[in-house]
A protein has these predicted regions:
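Active-site C-terminal subdomain of aminotransferase-like
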Residues: 1-94
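A generic structural motif
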Residues: 5, 69-72, 116-118, 161-165
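Short, hydrophobic beta-strand segments
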Residues: 65-66, 111-116, 155-160
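Non-catalytic, mobile gating and regulatory segments of ester bond hydrolases
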Residues: 94, 99-100, 172-175
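Short amphipathic beta-strand starts and helix->beta connectors
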Residues: 95-98, 138-143
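Short beta-strand
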Residues: 100-105, 144-148
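Conserved PLP-binding catalytic core of the aspartate aminotransferase-like
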Residues: 101-136
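PLP-dependent enzyme catalytic core of the Aspartate aminotransferase-like
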Residues: 146-190
């Protein structure tokens, strides 16, 4: 599990759910004089034999405790809100002129780019969108990211921060709209 992505938990938080612990031992257990095994009949877990780490950081506690304190309904409600916000952001961005959607929402992420009418795909359009992204992120009120889909530089919106709500999406869309206007009138394209 990677709960930092959809469960709003810190990086490095995680757990591995296994059905058969002997598979972990087959993959990780090593014999060395400086790592003597526990007694075979012991009920103690030999962490050296089930993990590449030689100690236990207990990352699973960082998953279990928030669920114990807040319940699964809280996490489900927040995640549902973020999925809805992604769809909302997608519809708002899709409605903007000279914005081209390159990847529709997958869970909480979608990709788009600025596409002026007189610019065909290629290095020039990629460079233009890199500048577009820099300008959108300049306010430091939100952080859009980038990726390449094939050879095309794209701008991504990923809605996963637990403090992100509709007003933040509205502000982000307004900033994309503002930068689009500046690029369209030539203020930022050179």
């Amino acid at each position: 599990m990677e709960p930092h992505k959809g469960l709003f938990l810190p990086y490095g938080t995680g757990c591995l759910l296994v059905k058969n612990a002997c598979h972990l031992e087959q993959a990780h257990k090593v014999a060395a004089k400086y790592l003597p095994p526990f007694q075979e009949e012991s009920d103690r877990i030999d962490f050296c034999g089930i993990s590449p780490e030689l100690s236990r950081d207990f990352r699973g506690l960082r998953v279990w405790l928030p669920f114990k304190l807040f319940g699964t309904q809280t996490f489900a409600a927040y995640l549902d809100e973020k999925l809805d916000l992604c769809q909302y952001a997608f519809k708002q961005i899709q409605a903007l002129e000279q914005i081209e959607i390159l990847a529709e929402p997958t869970l909480s992420t979608f990709a788009f780019r600025y596409r002026p009418r007189d610019c065909s795909p290629g290095d020039e359009l990629n460079s233009l969108n890199q500048r577009f992204l820099t300008e959108v992120n300049r306010t430091k009120r939100f952080l859009l990211s980038a990726t390449y889909l094939g050879d095309e530089f794209t701008i991504r919106i990923c809605v996963l921060a637990f403090r992100t709500h509709q007003r933040h999406i509205d502000d982000c869309v307004e900033e994309v709209r503002r930068v689009t206007r500046l690029f369209n009138d030539g203020s930022l394209t050179n």
